[in-house]
Structures are given as C-alpha cells and as structure tokens.
Amino acid sequence: MVDVPRLMSTQHPDNATLPFFTAGDVIEGEDEIQEAYYVYSHLGCDEQMWDFEGKEGDEYAVKKLLSRYDEFFADHQLGTDVRLTVRGPNPDVEGSEAKILLEILESIPRSFDAARRFAGEYGLETTAPIFEVIVPMVTDADQLNAVHEYYERFVTGKADEAVWDGRTVEEWVGEFDPASITVIPLIEEREAMLAADDIVREYATAHDQDAVRVFLARSDPALNYGCLAADLINKVALQRLYEMSEATGVDVHPILGAGSAPFRGNLTPERAAATADAYSEVETFTVQSAFKYDYPVETVRDGVATLRDADLGAPPFPIDEARALAVIDRTADAYADQVDAIAGTVNRLSSYVPDRRARKLHVGLFGYAREVGENALPRAIGYTASLYAVGCPPTLLGAHALTDDDAAFVREAFPAYFDHLADAARYFNPRCTDVLDLDDDTLAAAVERVDVTPNSEHRAATDDAIDALQRGDDDALRSAIRRGARERQFLG
C-alpha cells in the first residue's frame, strides 16, 4: 500500500458557519467540487471523502476536478499526491439505495479514463484517481468481500466478454482500469467494532491483502452508547486490531471519524495536538466541516499541519479490556435510560436545526441497537445540535453512572475523556430540565467532575431557545440555535 493519507476531509454537515464558496445555506452539487479543490490546495488535506451514502454525490467529480483545476492537479496528482475516496451505501442495511453502490463501482473505470487523458495531456504517468471504496455500517467481512468481488467479476471482469459477433466489451468501449480496488470498512456498531480485528483478518485473507485501512466511527457509537463508551469501544477495537496485525503480519491503517463536538470526538483545529496524542495509534483523522469552516483559515491550516506532522501509527497504550467493557456497559445503560426520556423532545428540536448539506433520510444504527431501545432519533449531528440548543451537551448523558473507581480507571486509560467533559460542561444550562425530562442531580453529578467556567454568551442563547420552545416561537428558536452554534464553533 502506498503512503496512507493523514487528513480525510469529509462532507459531514456539522458547521455553524457557511464557507465562502457557497451562495445558499446548504453546501451541495458544484460547491462540493470546489470544496475538494479548496481542502487540497489551501488547507493541506491529502484526502477527500466523496460521499454517496445518505446524500447525492457527483459521479463525474474526477473529470470536473481535473478540467477545472488542471494546473493544480498537474503538480499534485490525483490518486498519489492527493486522494478522492468514495463512500457508498451498504446494501445489507440500506436496501432502497443498494444499487447506488453498483453505479459507484461502474463509474471508477470511467474516472480512470478521465485521469488517463489528463495524464497524457500533461506528460504524466497514469495513476488510478479512485481505487478505494468505503462501505459504511459494516458488521462482517462478507459485506467487504461482496464489494471487492463484484468489482473484479462484474465491472472489470466483463472486459473479455463478447457482446456481438466475437467483439469483446473491451474492444467495444476500451479498457477497464484499475483492475481491482480495496474496500475500507466503516465500522459503527459496538459488537462489530469489537470484532474489527476478525473482520479485517477475514477480508485480508480472502483477497491476499497485506495491508487494510479500517475506518472506526466515533459519532454513531456516541449516539448509540454515549460519549465515554464510544471512546472506550474505539480504544479496545484499536488494541485488538494491533494485536491481530502483530500476529498475522497484515498492516492495519486505522482511520478515526471524529467531529468537532466533544460528543463526536472533540477534534478541532485548536485540539489537533491533544487528539493526536489521545489517539496516537490512528493514522488518518477526518477533517469535518466545522473544523474547516468555523475557525479562521490560518487556525485551520495550523491544525491540519499539526495532525500531518504528528507521530501517528504508534502501538496502542495497553487497556484493561474487561474493565473497559464493564464501564462501557454501565455508562451505556445509564445513557440509554436518559435518551428514552428525551427522545420526543430531541426529535421536535431537530426540525429547527439548520441543514448544511443536501442529504437524504439516513437509516442509522440507533433504531437497531438493543442497548438503546427502539427510539427513532435524528442523525448524530442533528441530535447533538438539538441538545446543545437547550444547554444539555450530550457528553453529560450517562456520565453520572461513573463510580469513583471508574473515574480513576478512565483517567489512566483515556484521560482525554475529562477534556471532552470539560469542553462540553461549559455549555451546560441547568434550565435544560425545563424542557427535557432529565434529573437535575444526575446532570450535576456529571458537571461536578470537572471545573469549568460557563460560557455566558452560549447560556444566553440557550435561555432564549428554551423560552422560544416553551412559547412556540419557531423563528426565535431557529435564531437562538444558530447563535449558540456560532458561539461554540460547531453546529452538532
């Protein structure tokens, strides 16, 4: 495997501030072509996720990038110097969108053709602009094997098939390159994450891979099990992946899908060094929209440079798995009980959260996860934004279940959790229980574990949001939600 990218820019709609290149309130279509160029050329990201999962994606992205920004890509070759990595739906989970995955796979050789023409014009060696596909919500290796095999058998494999009178498909429409792709599992559900080592081993063995990139989610596990549980699940998964790699010789290159909100990973430009230290075994971090657009551009570039230059890919700090799993169980159960009590209000609030990307309905894992019941909730960003809107950072939920012994263990195993808790607690408004069916004492128990000064501007915004919700003033509620998001520098 060639050098692994450090910074994967994504299209997550967690930004409070709109970027300069979009005319409306939603980033979509041609905006995302310009965004990809911007993150490569101005921010220093070396990878852009091109997302078809839960949103519309442009299958002609490669052709448009190369034709519009030819001078840049003549010096920074797409596929080697910078990457475009597509994410499609998982047919086993999102059946109504399943065939979109096939369309994505069929488009890869067409993108290669565009890159071949571009390379010829500029005297460059042709390289595949797209050669990896991210599959979300993976629960077993069969889902990866199916994608890998489909591409080789039915996309490139049809080249030698005769279409008429002995003429082959390749003779008719040209070569099909690249000959093969690699599949990146995006693993989001607890049991699958804890079995990530088995999933990667089985996939690598089936296709004789000597290296695999594996994408561990941070937002959806938090939505499903709570903030602390999400980090501990990731830490156990990373330890197991490392042990598998040592035992088999398969190189594992972890990606962590962290956002700016503490609940979703607490990865901001200002916390880049702290995140790299907390997850030094990770090799690629996601750079989501709030990271890119809610800070001054020089601050963003500094954060990108910090991650790019960090000493990543280190062996994990050993964690007591049995102890970690016990804390996960205890806090996740407490978190689920609180979510049960507030789900209705969260859904109501989410309708007032501004959209930042053109997206479709997302199936998600929350409704399928027994650990959290059968509540239908918004996506993680909308959920997080809804709770922040009324001064209840979701990082606080479930934290009251920590015993003093648990807290001592967490300070040793993952001390960054208390930074997450502190960064969230400054936005806590005790009045949130006026509109959320939560116990004051349990929230206070979480807040009291850290020493913070409340953010007065955010407190005022959440006071206004609570008042507007109670009196049914929709416009005032929307305005207060936006004001609070700008103050904390992320939407959700």
Curated annotation (Swiss-Prot):
This is Phosphoenolpyruvate carboxylase. It comes from Halobacterium salinarum (strain ATCC 700922 / JCM 11081 / NRC-1). Its cofactor is Mg(2+). Belongs to the PEPCase type 2 family. It catalyses: oxaloacetate + phosphate = phosphoenolpyruvate + hydrogencarbonate. The keyword Glycoprotein does not apply. Its EC number is 4.1.1.31. Catalyzes the irreversible beta-carboxylation of phosphoenolpyruvate (PEP) to form oxaloacetate (OAA), a four-carbon dicarboxylic acid source for the tricarboxylic acid cycle. Homotetramer. One of its GO terms (biological process) is oxaloacetate metabolic process. Keywords: Carbon dioxide fixation, Lyase, Magnesium. The keyword Magnesium applies. SUPFAM superfamilies: Phosphoenolpyruvate/pyruvate domain. GO terms for molecular function: magnesium ion binding; phosphoenolpyruvate carboxylase activity.
